[in-house]
Amino acid sequence: MIVLKITSIGADISDNDTSCSRELIASLEASIPGLLDAGAESAALTNITGDDVVISAFVEDDMLETVNRAIVEILRDSSESLGDLEGISDEPDGAGEGISYAEAAVRQDRYPDAVILAFDTYGGEDFVADVANSAIAAARGMDGVTDVSQEIRPGVREIPGVGYVSDKTDDPVVAATIEDIESVGVAAGAMLGAALGHKNVHLVRRGSPSYVIPGSVIVSATAFLNGNLIDLAVPFEERTRILRVL
């Protein structure tokens, strides 16, 4: 049986430590259609978080490695600085601080819908792994969630079709596939609540620079729904306002 998956690859390829230039974003977005030629069913620049970007694609399992390689090539061709791309190795022994990766399966009879969280640190704050894992744990087993990407663990990680990266990778990506459109808000709310419950974690809009006090983590949240993007920071900012009753 052919399994449809979401694959999300994040990287710091900016020439500064706080933001992504308009030129970088435009170059990446112009290259996204090439992923459809490589075998993706849909693809997008889903998250822009500080100086990190995430490209995501829905792809059949037998084309996963090909599409992953194509994503990395787009990142490489558009990069202002090779940054995280330099940490990729063909062998585990050579793995360094590299790209981030998340993968989750889509149920066969469902629309390809997912929630993607992307984190950025200014100084490689090591507690970001705990923050990401809290979001993963919150989504796992929820009604309305099909699958969640694997936890951030110590040790070298293999990215299908790309190579190996070390556990020094410090800007994780989390992806969760959703059963139905009504569950998007519930799943995203649980994931964001778990992440934001940690100290010094801030929700930002897609494309925001990391203008925070060092020692902090920022997170962006995107719904990737049947090929369409929704920046979830906007509705959640409104939904979490205190209701004034006096």
Swiss-Prot record:
Source taxon at top rank: Archaea
Similarity field: To M.jannaschii MJ1676.
Name of the protein: Uncharacterized protein MTH_564
Lineage: Archaea, Methanobacteriati, Methanobacteriota, Methanomada group, Methanobacteria
